Amino acid sequence: MKPTILLYDSGMGGLTVYDEIRKKLPNAHYLYYFDNACFPYSEKPTEVLVERATKMVQKMAKNYPLDLVVVACNTASTVVLPTLRKIFPFPIVGTVPAIKPAAALSQTKTIGLLATKGTITRPYVLSLIEQYAPNCQIEKIGSTALVELVEQKLQTGVIDLTRLTPIIADWQNHPTLDTVILGCTHFPMAKTELQQLLPNVKYFLDSGNAIANRVTHLIMHSPHNQQLEKQRENLAFCTQQNNQFKQQAKIMQRWGFPQLNTLMI
């Protein structure tokens, strides 16, 4: 039996996490569910994120024998994990900014945290900084616009640098910044452009590989759901069908999801 793994995000940023996981578990059965009806999650209230996460996982668990769920969104992960772990019997893996490895890697101990506005203000993230980077200077930029720029890149293949530059302008001439944490699953898709605009930064870190390692460990040490399924191809779902649906379906096909379905909550 192939394990069934669900990943969910507000948009397609979670595909960066999926990409890392499938390198280690190429034969797993993947479900990807993006909440485009509530995109982006960046500044949504905690109660909205928890309610939608619960409903999305419940819908999928009702229809598919889930072995593991990945919350492939930093913003959601800062608030939804305790509730999901209380409700569901299977492992729930979250996505947190790579603060610990960044603190170990940075030579100047000046680190940039590039995330959504919601993520950089959450107590959970502030506690990670206190725990793992107490001796580091953490420069924070919270951006909803960059999430939207990445979604556009998935459709057009390019990011408008004239729109990206103002977002990270404060870091461009920073004398000691040597490490940037990509604290949103969308942002690895903008890594090339960020490297171009921030040539003095040595390290750009995201959590994708660490999540993949954690998922692999849990799958290898968990009994897989023995319920038989007729449909074993990877499937993608969204929460609303809008004027971007056909383009989004093509994008999901490129990432290994032959079919995009609408599953409202």
Curated annotation (Swiss-Prot):
It catalyses: L-glutamate = D-glutamate. Transmembrane segments: none annotated. Substrate binds at residues 9-10, 41-42, 74-75, 185-186. It comes from the Bacteria. GO terms for biological process: cell wall organization; peptidoglycan biosynthetic process; regulation of cell shape. SUPFAM superfamilies: Aspartate/glutamate racemase (SSF53681). Pathway: Cell wall biogenesis; peptidoglycan biosynthesis. GO terms for molecular function: glutamate racemase activity. The active site is at residues 73, 184. Belongs to the aspartate/glutamate racemases family. Provides the (R)-glutamate required for cell wall biosynthesis. This is Glutamate racemase. It comes from Haemophilus ducreyi (strain 35000HP / ATCC 700724). The lineage of its organism: Bacteria, Pseudomonadati, Pseudomonadota, Gammaproteobacteria, Pasteurellales.
